Every structure is written in C-alpha cells, then in structure tokens.
Amino acid sequence: MHGELPSESDKNEFEEIIKNHTLLNEQIIQFYRGFRRDAHPMAMMIGIVGALSSFYHDSLNIEDPEHRMIASHRILAKMPTIAAMAYKYSVGQPFVYPVNKLNYADNFLHMCFATPTKEYEINPLFSKIMDQIFIPVSYTHLRAHETQY
C-alpha cells in the first residue's frame, strides 16, 4: 500500500489488521434485506459499501493520510464479507460469518460456500486461484486510490 514490498513484520501486521476488521456491523447486515432476492450482487455490494460511511464517520477526512489508510484497511477487510453476503442473499442461503484464522482467499470461499449445517472443505486449487484473482484486483484498486489524492 506504500509503493514497495513490505518487510515480513509489516506484512504480518497488515494481515492482522485486515483479519481484525472482517466483520460487518449487524445493522449493515440488515441492509441486505432491503434488496430484492434477484438484485444483481454488484448492486447490493455498491449499496452496502456506500452505507459503510454512515458507520465509520470517525475516519472520513480524505485530506488526512491516516484516515485514508484506516478506510483502505476497512474496505480491504470487509469487501470479501460484503461480496460473500451479497452472493448468499441472492441464492437464499443464510449468511456465514468470517473465520479470522483463515487466510483472505480461504475466508472468502468459506463465507460463500459453507452453510450453518455443513462446513466447506476448501480446495487448495480454488484457494490459489482466488489468491491470484485478489492480488491484481486489490493492487488495481489501491493504485487508483493512491492517485486520487
């Protein structure tokens, strides 16, 4: 996020920050029920992401680099949860909460495909593929984020 590869300790610290911000406020989860079941998941995600600012008004000053970093951490941490919940809602299944002991890709797969009655066995190949998808997506968004300010 700072234009260079992190040290091992910086990487570990970043991963912990992300893992500790994966949950959504329960009131945000209620927003999903306002969407039709056949709404496109991307439309749901856009609505939910927009609603986040009403819950995190403590860090909305885009002129403050620390606020931008906090917002970046939050959106990176919460986006898999938001996306998985949009998917679960669209297919009529109960939401599955994040499990922070899992890595980023595995957690996303878990939230998408586990159910309250059946644990999802994560396929290592799918996990690797999701990692490969998430890397360029997050890099692209972060680079766009950096150039806006």
Could you say what each language-model-derived stretch is?
Residues 43-139:
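Glycine-rich, mobile lid/loop segments that gate access to catalytic sites or pores
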Residues 1-33:
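An N-terminal structural lobe/cap that precedes and organizes the functional/catalytic core
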Residues 6, 25, 79-80, 144:
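Proline-rich low-complexity regions
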Residues 14-17, 28-38, 45-50, 65:
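Short, glycine/charge-rich beta-strand/loop segments that flank catalytic centers
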Residues 140-147:
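Conserved small/polar residues in nucleotide/adenosyl-binding loops
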Residues 2-6, 32-40, 66-70:
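Short coil/turn segments at secondary-structure boundaries
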